[in-house]
């Protein structure tokens, strides 16, 4: 489902993948899969005032599926902030061990509960609260997955670094100054954002030092590419997240063979 760019949701051309998929499901009839899982960004809950979420769930309900959803953040497993909505539908008897009578705040936050409350009665009757085990506590932060001595050519120029710093608000610049005051190696994840300030669209660079990366994008994605601002001995240096680092953030071991070319 397309929620980037024009945010056309289920009506966007790229969302034809869902309708094409659903047409195949409907034609299967008794041969249709008993369990279906769909993944999308959390923004689906509010897309077109919740109508896209309702439409999608209604397709499952009308086809005789029980359906529920969970919001799961990759931060539970890896130092990357990447919240995704997982819609799980099942036709047939539901194992009691996989369902619960009420939402779980870990996987069913208020935004999801509010979207469920807004469902029409017929679709609401098909809703199920899925039960998930809690994952073990994450034991790595962003710094643990970064290369301390990357190839020299990946570093951006001093001018590019200063230009990015100039795009920061005082709050974010203070965070950088605090890192510069510490002689130890440190790295913060940086995104460029368009913010509305005094009715004008302004490009801002925003940095986080919480041991987390922001949501990684694909080369063809519509969001800002993530950068790293590395500080050591009072010097700031700027570079992108490397392909191998991105793979680590996605949970892949270093033994995984990356394809040729840029992948992050």
Describe each PLM feature range.
Residues 1-3, 44-47, 78-81, 94-97, ...:
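Short catalytic/ligand-binding loop motif for oxyanion handling, primarily in non-cytosolic enzymes
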Residues 3, 20-23, 27, 248-251:
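Residue-level signal for well-ordered alpha-helical scaffold segments within enzymatic catalytic domains
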Residues 6, 39-41, 263-264:
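Short linear capping/connector segments at secondary-structure termini
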Residues 14-91:
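Conserved Class I SAM-dependent methyltransferase catalytic core
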Residues 80-155, 159:
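Flexible, glycine-/basic-rich loop-and-beta segments that form/coincide
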Residues 145-264:
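C-terminal target-recognition/interaction regions appended to catalytic cores
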């Amino acid at each position: 489902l397309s929620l980037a760019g024009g945010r056309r949701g289920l009506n966007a051309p790229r969302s034809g993948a869902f309708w094409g998929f659903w047409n195949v499901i409907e034609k299967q009839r008794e041969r249709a899969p008993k369990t279906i899982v769909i993944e999308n960004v959390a923004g689906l809950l509010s897309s077109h005032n919740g109508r896209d979420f309702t439409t999608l769930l209604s397709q499952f309900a009308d086809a005789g599926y029980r359906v529920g959803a969970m919001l799961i953040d990759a931060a539970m497993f890896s130092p990357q902030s990447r919240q995704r909505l997982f819609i799980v539908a099942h036709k047939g008897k539901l194992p009691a061990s996989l369902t619960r009578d009420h939402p779980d705040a870990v996987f069913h936050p208020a935004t999801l509960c509010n979207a469920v409350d807004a469902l029409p009665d017929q679709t609401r009757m098909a809703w199920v609260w899925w039960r998930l085990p809690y994952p073990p506590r994450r034991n790595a932060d962003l710094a643990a997955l970064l290369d301390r001595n990357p190839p020299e050519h990946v570093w951006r120029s001093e001018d590019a670094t200063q230009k990015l710093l100039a795009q920061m608000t005082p709050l974010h610049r203070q965070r950088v100054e605090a890192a510069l005051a510490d002689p130890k190696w440190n790295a913060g994840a940086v995104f460029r954002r368009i913010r509305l300030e005094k009715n004008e669209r302004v490009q801002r660079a925003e940095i986080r030092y919480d041991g987390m990366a922001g949501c990684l994008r694909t080369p063809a994605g519509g969001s800002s590419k993530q950068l790293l601002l590395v500080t050591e001995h009072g010097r700031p240096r700027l570079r992108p997240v490397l392909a191998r680092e991105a793979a680590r953030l996605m949970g892949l071991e270093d033994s995984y063979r990356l394809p040729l070319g840029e992948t992050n």
